[in-house]
Amino acid sequence: MKFEKAIRMKAKLRLALTGPSGSGKTYGALLIAQGIGGKIAVIDTEKGSASLYAHMAEFDVLELDPPYTPERFVEAVQAAEGAGYNVLIVDSITHEWSGVGGCLELVDQIANAKYRGNSWSAWNEITPRHRAFLDALMRSPMHIIATARSKTETAQTEQNGKKKVVKLGMKAEQRDGLEYEFTTVLDIVHEGHFAVASKDRTGLFGGDPQPISVETGKTLLDWLESGAETVDQLTPALEAISNAATVDNLRKHYEAAVELLGERIEIKRAKNARYRELTAPPEQTAPEQADAA
């Protein structure tokens, strides 16, 4: 074991935009994506709402219909990676949690079908699936902008012997602790396209509401690119897979690559190509073909 000096490396954007319905999350995400630049893709679970903004930016869209299982989101993320997009907007990740076929609904189904209504046991099955969804976002080679619907969180208190419901603020409709996954979380103020950072590792956003614009994306990109060069871990992993001498060797190299870099489409393609090569029947020489005849 050896400790080394901490260095901030170049990174990809991991941004969450939260806000109530109609606050402009999709619009804001597209503005920021424009500032980052490159090919933009949108996973749209909001019934075509992203396409309403086709006039303001050039982007491709995948309209994702129910069921909103974690696996369908992972598949969509991998499809965007394989198509070579630079920025992916997931609009919105709330559906993976509380939408039709999302985690909450899956827990109820599994609890009733297998555990006599015991949701604790059902969560043991769903939590790894939800974790795989988050890992697909966090380990992606693309810049990720995720939107999440927020709602007013309330609590019941007692004052002078009387029960009273008090507002605690806005909370994203996703699993608790979601904010820890992202570099920055911007909470959109309903009145206009302004946002307040509820979490910010970049130090770019103060405590006051700031307008969301194309410049927001450019500023974030400058910060992301100002770090030191990252070590290329993908190339040696792909080379190890492509040069595997046996199927067992291939499996070990593939599992090591997934553990390090996640289930990326390039890794999967390299594994499948090498597997076909290793399992293909050997080519017959001319004398062998004559003998076989």
Where are these regions (language model features)?
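Short, basic, glycine/proline-bearing loop/turn elements
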Residues: 12-19, 55-65, 114-122, 159-160
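Phosphate-binding/switch region of NTP-binding enzymes
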Residues: 20, 127-217
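Hydrophobic positions on the alpha1 helix immediately C-terminal to the Walker A/P-loop
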Residues: 28
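Conserved nucleotide-binding/hydrolysis micro-motifs of P-loop NTPases
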Residues: 35, 46-50, 67, 93-96, ...
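Conserved P-loop NTPase nucleotide-binding/switch module
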Residues: 90-126
